[in-house]
Curated annotation (Swiss-Prot):
Region entry Incorporation in virion, spans: 10-14
Subunit structure: Homotetramer; composed of disulfide-linked homodimers. Interacts with F protein trimer.
UniProt similarity note: Belongs to the paramyxoviruses hemagglutinin-neuraminidase family.
Protein name (Swiss-Prot/TrEMBL): Hemagglutinin-neuraminidase
Region (Involved in interaction with F protein): 59-140
Residues the record marks as carrying a glycan: N77, N499, N511
Compositionally biased spans, kind Polar residues: 11-23
Coiled-coil parts of chain: none
Intravirion side stretches: 1-37
Top EC class for this record: hydrolase
InterPro entries: Hemagglutn-neuramid, Hemagglutn/HN, Sialidase_sf
Organism: Sendai virus (strain Fushimi)
Basic and acidic residues bias (residue ranges): 1-10
Catalytic activity: Hydrolysis of alpha-(2->3)-, alpha-(2->6)-, alpha-(2->8)- glycosidic linkages of terminal sialic acid residues in oligosaccharides, glycoproteins, glycolipids, colominic acid and synthetic substrates
Amino acid sequence: MDGDRGKRDSYWSTSPSGSTTKLASGWERSSKVDTWLLILSFTQWALSIATVIICIIISARQGYSMKEYSMTVEALNMSSREVKESLTSLIRQEVIARAVNIQSSVQTGIPVLLNKNSRDVIQMIDKSCSRQELTQLCESTIAVHHAEGIAPLEPHSFWRCPVGEPYLSSDPKISLLPGPSLLSGSTTISGCVRLPSLSIGEAIYAYSSNLITQGCADIGKSYQVLQLGYISLNSDMFPDLNPVVSHTYDINDNRKSCSVVATGTRGYQLCSMPTVDERTDYSSDGIEDLVLDVLDLKGSTKSHRYRNSEVDLDHPFSALYPSVGNGIATEGSLIFLGYGGLTTPLQGDTKCRTQGCQQVSQDTCNEALKITWLGGKQVVSVIIQVNDYLSERPKIRVTTIPITQNYLGAEGRLLKLGDRVYIYTRSSGWHSQLQIGVLDVSHPLTINWTPHEALSRPGNEECNWYNTCPKECISGVYTDAYPLSPDAANVATVTLYANTSRVNPTIMYSNTTNIINMLRIKDVQLEAAYTTTSCITHFGKGYCFHIIEINQKSLNTLQPMLFKTSIPKLCKAES
């Protein structure tokens, strides 16, 4: 440590030039401090004297200084106002200039940039869409969707109330809602349009119908027209069907009995392509060809044709047809309802009713499935499942609905609403009352039918509106119903309200025992045929589309017409 102190003293005692300096002694430092204190004391005394003199002068001139002070303040205020006005004017000019620039950018500059960017994006998409590997991606770029708040009516969500219990009301009476109809028609006087099929998906709808150019009899040639569109609101705030794209299939292909499904941005239809009449088809082994058509919103279409050997049938069939009414889409599959004649009948007891009927047994019901007019074939309903429907070659599998779960096989439709699948089948046999229920598509297939006593259909004399006793007959007409409540007890439909004739089309809202609210389309003599009803909600408010084949009597042809009603659901207040 002593060595280090010696080095430091040596450093500070040496100047940069190398010469040595003498360190000031303690006495010399003390003398300098006393001198500075004396100087500071004198300065303080001088400042005190100066302050006293200034105060005396101010007091002497006080009378004059107050007036000068006021004038000074006023001058300062005026100067401040001038500065304020100058600043305000300057700021206003700057703001106006900047606002003009912003307005110019918004009205001109930004739109120009947006248009340029839009063109760039469109060009990029077009270039991408020219590549085959991106075709599926590009097909999804067309933005078509139902109006906001519109969705297929789901009974579980619809049939409820904030307070109280829901019910169908008879007052006020339902009425037709105004709006246009753009269903496909005929360009010839004698043209006949038949078999309307409507599927309403989450984003779009699909509609299909068959056109025969001369009369309604099958002449071996017919057009099939498939439309895709969306549901919008018209100026009266009522829903409308708005077609976006339409495709007409070759008249020589003679598609028949087509069922449709709308899912995603595509429409699918499954049709039969018969080369013989129906009775001849049932009398021979094997089925006529089936065809699956695909149509997208860009108008692109694709068709897959299947021969008997290419369809996975669980039993040999002599005839098989899609059921006209719409099908459903599930994960990876399309499911259509179908019907046809088995080459060899199945064993088992079918749905039956013997109470109140004379000389009727279970055997009577079993034999009633075998239709003499169709070569004695046992007519059953089937599930037609199209697997991998997005692939290059979808596969078709047919599963027969057990005869223990069903009545006579017939036309019909499927609806997937919420977590339930609803089934409707035409009352073509002895059971004339409405046939609607819940289908369990797991194995084995089961149907929980909802008994309806109020709704029926016209039929021949032996199987008319009121018939409930088993016997062999093939009659009736396709008049499907849409479930409004989860148990399908409350429904919307269009019935031909007559005993034996296809007349008097009437829109009906009904429960299992009573017709609650109804509207006759015209009069009891108006001739009609097939009807189909599909319902939607718009932010919870229910509406139904009714498509009815109306007989243009002066022309003696059929033409589907579109009608719309508001669902008369109310809430019963709790007492």
